[in-house]
Amino acid sequence: MDRFVVNPPWPELPRVTALLNGFPRDYHVHDYRTTLSLKAVVAGAARYATPGGRYLVTPDVFLVLNHGQRYSMEVDAESGTETLCPFFAPGFVEAAAWSAAAGDARQLDDVDARGAPFELVERLHPAVGPIAAILASMRAAVRARRAGAAWIEDRFHDLALALAALRDDTRREMETFPAVRRATREELYRRLYRARDFLVSCYAEPLTVAEAARVAALSPFHFHRAFRRAFGRTPMQLLQHHRLEVARRLLARGDEVTAVALAVGFDSLGSFSWLFRRKHGVAPSELRPGRKKQD
């Protein structure tokens, strides 16, 4: 019988459909083999690593890990992170995806169908749309202590259908990638998103095109060309854009300009200030609360 629970004991996790919500401090997971699961945070950040990628999960993105994937995860005590992670019992999302695709007549004839194995491309997704709304409602109910078993079960049904729709969206996006053969497009999609997630997750490090190309398992020139065709900007343009967006958020909360420049990967304060002004139209210090025009 399917069980739907909130914050179950860790050993039960592989056998139930569950929502984990909490405020871990100096929390580390090493080489855990997961069921199909979704990784999100309400506040702060969590770092995930799998054999194929590195991911920084923040409130504006979420990560889906497929059944059987091994991952490690860490949360720093000082980050004030609140995690929100649904785990799905084996077969649950498969059945939902099959039901969404099959007609009523077929389902009447085959009530026990479980569907084909469900798998999504391992990548960061923007925390928008139905999935973000469902997660927000689940978190609000848990915090308010009104997340009964029946209510949680309904939300997991909604979430499973939303994941099936996300897989359909991903397949449509794959069709837009620059390659003739379908298999090539799918593989290029996986590799380019792996590198893209690496760039936006490791932005504080001194990254290069060659390093990102190695993550994608492509030659630097092939990677650079394919990345620009797929995402409309070069790898370094995307990295710079992301660094400046993170910097804007850090400055708005009151962090020092020099500390922010270093935190987002700039080794020159002058270069950071010039690029920031060019992108946002104001000097970095003008975004800090109570500080105006001091750069």
Residue ranges and their predicted role:
Residues 199-202, 247-254:
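Short helix-to-turn junction characteristic of helix-turn-helix DNA-binding domains
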Residues 145, 205, 253-255, 265:
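Flexible coil/turn residues that form the inter-helical turn or adjacent wing/linker of helix-turn-helix
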Residues 96, 159-167, 227, 251:
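Hydrophobic recognition helices of helix-based DNA-binding modules
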Residues 247, 260-261:
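Hydrophobic positions on the alpha-helical face of helix-turn-helix-like DNA-binding modules
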Residues 2-112, 143-150:
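N-terminal regulatory/effector-sensing and dimerization cores
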Residues 112-197:
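An amphipathic alpha-helical interaction segment
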Residues 168-169, 175-189, 194-242, 261-290:
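Basic/polar phosphate-binding segments, predominantly the helix-turn-helix DNA-binding elements
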